Amino acid sequence: MTMKLGNYKDNDVELCRTTNSRVSTHTAEALLEQHIPFTKNSKKIPFFKREAYKGADTLWVITINPRRYGQARRVIDSMDRVYKDRLVLSNY
């Protein structure tokens, strides 16, 4: 069953990803302060692929509506360098 909410389509794009839970929480708080809607999901990293992620077991992915992407990138660009350096930004 598909629910239709007006012209809503599930076409969110990835804003950023990180393996650090604290960085993902700080990024989510920064987006909330600016009233930017987003979705934060976690993905479990398989045991044998953890070496590529420096031993992390969870990958946090923040997705956003494409129309709000520019505004969200400005929020991330204004974050502290300590947090920003731990994010992998997409090139949407």
Regions found by a protein language model. Name each.
Residues 1-92:
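Acidic/polar low-complexity segments and flexible, solvent-exposed patches
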